UniProtKB/Swiss-Prot annotation:
The gene is infA1. Its main location: cytoplasm. One of the essential components for the initiation of protein synthesis. Stabilizes the binding of IF-2 and IF-3 on the 30S subunit to which N-formylmethionyl-tRNA(fMet) subsequently binds. Helps modulate mRNA selection, yielding the 30S pre-initiation complex (PIC). Upon addition of the 50S ribosomal subunit IF-1, IF-2 and IF-3 are released leaving the mature 70S translation initiation complex. Keywords: Cytoplasm, Initiation factor, Protein biosynthesis, RNA-binding, rRNA-binding. Component of the 30S ribosomal translation pre-initiation complex which assembles on the 30S ribosome in the order IF-2 and IF-3, IF-1 and N-formylmethionyl-tRNA(fMet); mRNA recruitment can occur at any time during PIC assembly. Pfam families: eIF-1a. This is Translation initiation factor IF-1 1. It comes from the Bacteria.
Length: 72
């Protein structure tokens, strides 16, 4: 899968789940399971419920996402 194949969307974190996983509600109303990207883990970026985030979805599984950015 090339980097061009990902779908970027905005969303809001609804709740924390175990293992750095979050329930994220997207702009279009869908709710997906999101995990933190490796760079965010390395830099200890914390995510709390209510934070606005940017997620990447693959066309293969639209129920899971990777959280790549937390808006301030």
């Amino acid at each position: 899968m090339a980097k061009d194949d990902v779908i970027q969307m905005q969303g809001e974190v609804q709740e924390n789940l175990p293992n750095a996983t979050f329930r994220v509600k997207l702009e279009n109303g869908h709710v997906v399971l999101g995990h933190i990207s490796g760079k965010m883990r390395m830099h200890y970026i914390r995510i709390l419920p209510g934070d606005k985030v940017t997620v990447e979805l693959t066309p293969y599984d639209l129920s899971r996402a990777r959280i790549v950015f937390r808006a301030k």
